[in-house]
Regions:
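Short S/T/G/P-rich N-terminal loop/turn motif that feeds into the first structured element of a domain
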Residues: 1-60, 67-78, 90-130
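A short, acidic, amphipathic alpha-helical segment used as a generic capping/interface helix at domain edges
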Residues: 80-86
Length: 130
């Protein structure tokens, strides 16, 4: 994938979130609940799952990256079947959900209820990290 303007299968989720609970509760949810749960899911093509907090600690960003559309779909399915489906909205308000990459039509159907902003790949490169 180390070529300029070559299509790739990588899908990225970017969640922009407002915090509902206290900063301590949110950090605990990120570190002790959400991250360990996803880390231990059987999702071999999930390649990134990282939380970020704004400097004022009033908003958060969650970035998830997958090798392909099928892996991104599996993450949504696992989320929907987990305890996180109820706990996530207790901690965060989704301000924006952006999906980057070329997703399959079955994935578009899954994302319809999420009000996702779908953005297909146009140009650039992905060198990856060794």
């Amino acid at each position: 994938m180390n070529e300029l303007n070559k299509e790739n299968s990588i899908i990225t989720y970017i969640f922009e979130l407002g915090l509902i609970k206290s900063i301590d509760e949110v950090k605990e949810f990120m570190r002790e609940n959400s991250s360990p749960y996803v880390f231990n899911c059987d999702e071999p093509k999930t390649i990134r799952f990282e939380w970020f907090l704004s400097e004022d600690e009033k908003s958060a960003t969650l970035i998830e990256m997958f090798e392909d559309s099928d892996a991104a779909k599996l993450r949504l399915e696992n989320h929907s079947a987990s305890h996180l489906v109820e706990e996530f909205p207790e901690h965060f308000e989704i301000k924006q959900f952006i999906v980057l990459g070329d997703i399959k039509s079955d994935m578009k159907e899954k994302l319809a209820d999420w009000n996702a902003d779908l953005r297909g790949n146009v140009a650039g490169f992905f060198k990856g990290i060794d």
